[in-house]
A protein has these predicted regions:
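Positively charged n-region of N-terminal signal peptides that target proteins for export
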Residues: 1-5
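Bacterial N-terminal signal peptides
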Residues: 7-20
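Periplasmic c-type cytochrome electron-transfer domains
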Residues: 20, 27-34, 38-45, 52, ...
Length: 570
């Protein structure tokens, strides 16, 4: 369905810079509005409600703490005891046994360990050839960086399967600053509500002493899509309305499609900023065991004060995986998304194509709802219609027969990592040298910023099978030292958005440590974009980050400035 997208691409590029406008709302459960007493339900009913309302989150992950995962079967070769080290300088051979394939015609002698390429130059990292820019009217050559980038950028229309509910019309719309695949200042909206369950298993919407908290999604899932395709008005045949448009309930009219008003007050609300996808191929190449070891090291070094949570999530592309039955899917340590929803870039692409653009595909074949209500009457491509994949007619590809999700994943795998700014670092060398040291030593090494914002990680070697044996790491991604400034774990640093997606209720107050590479290109910081300066973002931290924040507060004003100057160079 790519041909219909070409005419819209030029128009899309012309209007891309127009900002979206959002109403400011409460950004965490801490600002939740309380009502008068609400009806009570049993804990079993509450759990059933929580499980049944989240239609948008197709699969869920399991909690997998470091203490339960001393050795991961993807991360250690059979017959060895190699448990990896995440510190590339102390143990550069740490990530050396991730289901390794012996050298053969596909796997010549691997290159020595080296730094991952980092630049904003719109060039391949070597996973695929560069190719040539796609001329107007052409569909490009897939399997090249330029061809894959073109598909990543193409605008989807209704005839392509857009919607009926969606947030954007292309991947690039949310990932484009300063180059295609990078961050942007665009948010998505999520909502739900909390139930409070006492020791007798009775739950209500009223907080109570000693009660446990159970998050429940808004109808249809926590994601509230910003856009909806035009839908036909019943009594005005020539005109169209917006009956699939989602809003945060309560809604007191029945103006949305079907059924009565939605009266539940979804009091937990949050924005989520779009994430950087540059360098994601290197993140995908990190061994499970490396991430588990980081979590274990944090807990040991800080006496349990800092304790990143590892969760394992289904890898959708593994043969035999049914995304609707997570138990059928092999799992890997999550690392993509604010809640570590995915571990592979193909699974991540499939999820985003449905939830952000509204296009069903091979791994997510059912449309999202509009606040829990079917959009089938307004869907030009019914879920019940079998659409064969171009590459394999025996498989159903939904609204993506050309499998654009493969191009999305391949493009992200081929991007270079976000670079640091050498000009800033040279011009302010003396100050930034001190700032860098403070980042790793303030107030001490155990509780510094770098305990979570890990500066360096080594990827698995080339010829390592990852993602349940579906992807063989090439030389371009293997044995690479990356500088992401993240541990890719879930933490409670006092800014959790109150939303549960993966890993169960204990993740409600947790978020993935955002990588700081390229952070100087973002002017709205933290998960919700509510912090506008580095100082504001630092001071919002609490919880596990309390020792580091107290250390920052105790710094002289000159040293605070030096630390921020270092961040401004990343």
């Amino acid at each position: 369905m790519r041909s219909l997208k070409l005419a819209a691409l030029v128009l899309f590029l012309a209007v891309l810079a127009l900002p979206s406008t959002f109403n400011r709302i409460a950004h965490s459960q801490s600002s939740e509005i309380t009502d008068a007493s609400e009806p009570t339900i049993s804990a079993e009913e509450a759990a059933s409600t929580a499980a049944s309302t989240d239609q948008a989150n197709k699969v869920s992950g399991d909690d997998d703490t470091a203490s339960k995962s001393a050795v991961d079967n993807e991360g250690v070769a059979e017959g060895t005891s190699d448990t990896f080290s995440y510190d590339a300088e102390i143990d550069p051979a740490g990530a050396s046994a991730d289901n390794r394939t012996p050298p053969d015609i596909r796997c010549p002698q691997p290159p020595p360990i080296g730094k991952a390429p980092a630049d904003f130059d719109n060039k391949t990292n070597g996973v695929v050839p560069q190719g040539t820019p796609v001329p107007p009217g052409d569909e490009g050559t897939l399997g090249t960086f330029e061809g894959d980038k073109f598909i990543f950028s193409v605008v989807d229309e209704i005839d392509d399967g857009l919607g009926p509910v969606y947030n954007a019309q292309s991947c690039r719309e949310c990932h484009q600053n300063p180059v295609t695949g990078a961050i942007s200042q665009i948010n998505e909206l999520r909502a739900g509500h909390n139930l409070y369950c006492n020791a007798h298993g009775v739950c209500s919407g009223t907080p109570c002493a000693g009660c446990s908290t159970l998050f429940v999604d808004a109808p249809g899932g926590s994601l509230i899509n910003d856009r909806g395709i035009p839908t036909k008005n019943n009594n005005t045949p020539p005109f169209f309305g917006a009956k699939v448009q989602e809003r945060v309930p309560p809604l007191y009219t029945a103006s949305i499609i079907g059924g009565p008003p939605l009266l539940a007050n979804e009091k937990v609300r949050t924005f989520r900023t779009s994430l950087n996808t540059l360098g994601d191929g290197f993140i995908e190449a990190i061994a499970n065991q490396t991430l588990i070891n980081i979590a274990s090291n944090q807990s040991s070094a800080t006496g349990g004060v800092v304790h990143g949570q590892v969760i394992k999530v289904p890898v959708l592309e593994v043969p035999g995986c049914n995304p609707n039955i997570p138990s059928t899917c092999p799992k890997r340590v999550g690392r993509f998304g604010w809640k570590n929803q995915h571990a592979s870039l193909l699974s991540f692409s499939s999820d985003a194509y449905l939830n952000e653009i509204g296009i069903t595909n091979r791994f997510t074949l059912h449309e999202n709802t509009s606040l829990g209500r079917s959009v089938a009457p307004f869907d030009n491509h019914p879920d019940s219609t079998f659409v064969p994949c171009d590459s394999d007619p025996s498989k159903d590809c939904g609204e993506d027969p050309e499998e654009d999700i493969k191009a999305f994943a391949e493009f992200m795998r081929a991007t270079k990592a976000p670079p640091q700014d050498p000009d800033i670092q040279a011009t302010f060398a003396a100050d930034i040298k001190i700032g860098r040291k403070l980042f790793s030593k303030m107030p001490d090494a155990a509780f510094s910023c770098s305990i979570c914002h890990v500066p360096k990680i080594l990827t698995s070697p080339p010829c390592t099978w990852i993602n349940g044996g579906t992807f063989l790491l090439p030389n371009a991604l293997g044995n690479k030292i990356i500088m992401p400034f993240s541990d890719f774990l879930l933490h409670d640093v006092g800014t959790g958005d109150g939303i549960v997606q993966n890993g169960g209720q204990k993740t409600r107050t947790k978020l993935r440590t955002p990588p700081l590479w390229g952070v100087r290109t973002r002017d709205r910081l933290m998960h919700d974009g509510e912090s506008l300066t580095f100082r504001e973002a630092i001071l919002r931290h609490a919880g596990e980050a309390t020792p580091a924040i107290n250390g920052f507060i105790a710094l002289s004003e000159a040293d605070k400035r030096r630390l921020i100057m270092y961040l401004e160079s990343l």
